[in-house]
């Protein structure tokens, strides 16, 4: 009850205050009074220079993340029914015969190859000593052979026609020169023999005519060189480690 009485009294006081307030009691018939705006000059604040604050680099250790285990996902095999492709019949392609003219290949002259003689030094083989083998004499008794009497057989003379033998061509055999090491012979002293001077008449040699040799031009076909394929060289990317540059302050500390 006391609370209700206090609430009612407070409400009455509030209503009285609102009614008796000067805004409610103001006379609205009077025009408003003009008040010019008051100019407030701006206040000058000099700029404050703050020296740069040096913040050392913060070391952040690398965070190691454990590997995440992903169980294998089972994918059932997808059944693809076989696709029937009917056979394609291609008509035979007629290729007319290509005429290739005969290629003229001139004879290639191969000069004879001269091989120098191969020198093989004599190989020294020491004599092998073989001791004499003793063989006892074998006794053979004499065999008696009675004399055989053969009557003379008459052989008529046989006529043999002369056999024609064509000449056999034997190619010249080239024997490589045999190397004979020089044999040292001591000088033999021979007394000088006097030979009277012999006068030989001059021998006339007629000039020999050598006809000019005509050599046919040698045809050298152009040599085709196929292009050489050079596979691309793989150069792995070069990874340069990051260069750590410590942060420098914009102004040296203590300059202000």
Curated annotation (Swiss-Prot):
Residue windows of the Sequence repeats: 31-35, 36-40, 41-45, 46-50, 51-55, 56-60, 61-65, 66-70, 71-75, 76-80, 81-85, 86-90, 91-95, 96-100, 101-105, 106-110, 111-115, 116-120, 121-125, 126-130, 131-135, 136-140, 141-145, 146-150, 151-155, 156-160, 161-165, 166-170, 171-175, 176-180, 181-185, 186-190, 191-195, 196-200, 201-205, 206-210, 211-215, 216-220, 221-225, 226-230, 231-235, 236-240, 241-245, 246-250
Function: This is a developmentally regulated putative cell wall protein.
Family as reported in the entry's similarity comment: Belongs to the plant proline-rich protein superfamily. ENOD12 family.
Signal sequence bounds: 1-26
Designated name of the protein: Repetitive proline-rich cell wall protein 1
Entry's localization field: Secreted, Cell wall
Keywords for the protein's UniProt record, in alphabetical order: Cell wall, Developmental protein, Repeat, Secreted, Signal
Domain of life: Eukaryota
């Amino acid at each position: 009850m006391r609370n209700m009485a206090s609430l009612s009294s407070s409400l009455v006081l509030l209503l009285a205050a609102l009614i008796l307030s000067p805004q409610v009691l103001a006379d609205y018939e009077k025009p408003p009074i003009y008040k010019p705006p008051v100019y407030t000059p701006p206040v000058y604040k000099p700029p404050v220079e703050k020296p740069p604050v040096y913040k050392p680099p913060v070391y952040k250790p690398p965070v190691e993340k454990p590997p995440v285990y992903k169980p294998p996902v089972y994918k059932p095999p997808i059944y693809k029914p076989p696709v029937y492709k009917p056979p394609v019949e291609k008509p035979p392609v007629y290729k007319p015969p290509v005429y290739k003219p005969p290629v003229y290949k001139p004879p290639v002259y191969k000069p004879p190859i001269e091989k120098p003689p191969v020198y093989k030094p004599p190989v020294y083989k020491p004599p092998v000593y073989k001791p004499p083998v003793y063989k006892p004499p074998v006794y053979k008794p004499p065999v008696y052979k009675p004399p055989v009497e053969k009557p003379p057989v008459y052989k008529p003379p046989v006529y043999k026609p002369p056999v024609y033998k064509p000449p056999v061509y034997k190619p010249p055999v080239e024997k490589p020169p045999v190397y004979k090491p020089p044999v040292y012979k001591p000088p033999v002293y021979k007394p000088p023999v006097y030979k009277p001077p012999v006068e030989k008449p001059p021998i006339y040699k007629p000039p020999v005519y050598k006809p000019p040799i005509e050599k046919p031009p040698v045809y050298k076909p152009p040599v085709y060189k196929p292009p050489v394929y050079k596979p691309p060289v793989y150069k792995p990317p070069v990874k340069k480690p990051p260069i750590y540059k410590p942060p420098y302050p914009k102004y040296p500390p203590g300059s202000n």
